[in-house]
């Protein structure tokens, strides 16, 4: 399992418990984190294999994962379970994510210095073997997937427009609730004037 999905030993232990549950429901685990604090929070990001996830899907995952964790009890204290989608400016945690989001801007951090730096920002150019390709100012470079400590999409107008268009085309958007979506998809910067 990639350390980008589950970083700490506890995260990895819990991921090993819940991944089969999530996959049996027809979803994929994108990221899992136990956030410490006064009251710990277990954050799970999941999606359908083809991408996307709805509130009902999150509730279904939450119910099944809760049942498993109640039996296994990997977190000693009381905690809050949060199940969500990866969001538009999603983390990139699996090698396939870097192929899915080719052309979109991303921020990548490495565990060690690579050519004097740890942070890279640029357009994703896919993968080649076990390397993630990213176009930076100096040109396209390859970073071994195992070198990555963090990676996520950068929220840009193009990303928002394309994700909304994809959701609309897939019938996942109720246009009656979001009248500014067509304007955004069409490339206009201003939402329609309120005529009420």
From Swiss-Prot:
InterPro entries, sorted: Ribosome_maturation_RimP, RimP_C, RimP_C_sf, RimP_N, RimP_N_sf
Entry keyword annotation includes Cytoplasm: yes
Gene3D superfamilies tied to this protein: Ribosome maturation factor RimP, C-terminal domain (2.30.30.180), RimP-like superfamily, N-terminal (3.30.300.70)
GO biological process, one term: translation
Major location (coarse): cytoplasm
Keyword line: Cytoplasm, Ribosome biogenesis
Pfam family, one: DUF150_C
SUPFAM superfamilies to which the protein is assigned, alphabetical: YhbC-like, C-terminal domain, YhbC-like, N-terminal domain
Subcellular location: Cytoplasm
GO CC annotation terms, alphabetical: cytosol
Disulphide bridges, residue numbers: none
Keyword Cytoplasm in record: yes
Function: Required for maturation of 30S ribosomal subunits.
Family statement: Belongs to the RimP family.
Designated name of the protein: Ribosome maturation factor RimP
């Amino acid at each position: 399992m990639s350390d980008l999905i589950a970083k700490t030993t506890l995260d990895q232990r819990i991921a090993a418990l819940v991944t089969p549950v999530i996959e049996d429901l027809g979803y994929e685990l994108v990221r899992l984190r136990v956030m410490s604090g006064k009251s710990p929070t277990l954050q799970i990001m999941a999606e359908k294999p083809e991408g996307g996830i709805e509130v009902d899907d999150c509730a279904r995952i939450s119910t099944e994962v809760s049942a498993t964790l109640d039996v296994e009890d990997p977190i000693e204290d009381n905690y809050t379970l949060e199940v969500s989608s990866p969001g538009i400016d999603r983390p990139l945690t699996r090698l396939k994510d870097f192929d899915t989001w080719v052309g979109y801007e991303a921020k990548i951090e490495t565990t060690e210095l690579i050519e004097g730096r740890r942070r890279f920002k640029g357009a994703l150019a896919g993968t080649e073997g076990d390397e993630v390709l990213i176009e930076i100012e100096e040109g396209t470079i390859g970073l071994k997937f195992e070198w990555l400590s963090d990676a996520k999409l950068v929220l840009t107008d193009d990303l928002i427009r394309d994700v909304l268009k994809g959701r609309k085309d897939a019938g996942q958007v109720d246009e009656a609730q979001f009248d500014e979506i067509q304007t955004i998809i069409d490339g206009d910067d201003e939402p329609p004037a309120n005529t009420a």
